[in-house]
Structure formats: structure tokens, C-alpha cells
């Protein structure tokens, strides 16, 4: 079953990315490298509960 998750950046507090994940395959929190418009570079965005 796929669920929707919000990705946030700890440095800037941005929550601009929405994605989905399969809970069975990735039970841990998701971490993806995405572009941050505020920082103008690619940074790590983590899943927010």
C-alpha cells in the first residue's frame, strides 16, 4: 500500500515536496536529495511525520 509523505528540509524549514512510498518496502523514514530554492542547491529532504 502506497502512502503520501511530505518531505521537509531541517535547515530552512521548507516543506515543498510531496511524494509517495510503499510502507512495506521502506519502513524507515524516507530521505531524498532535492533542490532547495532558498539555498539554491541540492540538499537532503527528510520525511515528516
From Swiss-Prot:
One GO term (biological process): translation
Encoding gene, per UniProt annotation: rpmG
GO molecular-function terms, A-Z: structural constituent of ribosome
The keyword Ribosomal protein is annotated on this UniProt entry: yes
Pfam families with a match to the protein in the record: Ribosomal_L33
Keyword vocabulary terms for this entry: Ribonucleoprotein, Ribosomal protein
The organism of origin for this protein: Leuconostoc citreum (strain KM20)
Gene Ontology terms: cellular component: cytoplasm; ribonucleoprotein complex; ribosome
Protein name: Large ribosomal subunit protein bL33
Family: Belongs to the bacterial ribosomal protein bL33 family.
Key word Ribonucleoprotein present: yes
Segment forming the signal sequence: none
